[in-house]
Amino acid sequence: MIEKPRVEVCFTPNQYPLHIEDFQVVVAIDVLRATSAICTAFQYGVKKIIPVSTLDEAIEYKEKGYYVAAERKGKIVSGFEFGNSPLSYMNNDLKDETLVLTTTNGTKAINVAKGIEHLVIGALINLDALSKYLLRLNLSLIHI
């Protein structure tokens, strides 16, 4: 058992390339809202979430008929019915559906780490489950 994992913290998606090493786990946390919205959406039955970095990608999915949530600078982007507020997902409207999500920072943080074997979503609302999961993985290098 590894006694003390090394934990590195990266504060913005733009800094991620400067921190890249042989990390075994990346935990994507958007302290303000994105990861809380993702956790809430799953809690209320969303089947799958596709995080995209740009509005252009989000528009492409919307044109294909997907439910799409888009936020920039804390506001729902015009033309989209959902944003990054967890309250938007506290119902069964999207139960068993796929949701495409783009946010100012959160989805960018997720996408820069896509190649990592263990990419997990962290939020204050899933902190207990996240901590237990990371301990079960028993890995030595964790990047947050």
Regions inferred by a protein language model and the residue ranges of each:
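Acidic/Gly/His-enriched mid-domain segments of enzyme catalytic cores or analogous surface patches
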Residues: I50-N138
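N-terminal glycine-/serine-/threonine-rich phosphate-binding loop
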Residues: M1-A58
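Acidic-glycine-rich active-site phosphate/pyrophosphate-binding loop
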Residues: I2-R6, L134-L139
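Conserved small/polar residues in nucleotide/adenosyl-binding loops
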Residues: I142-I144
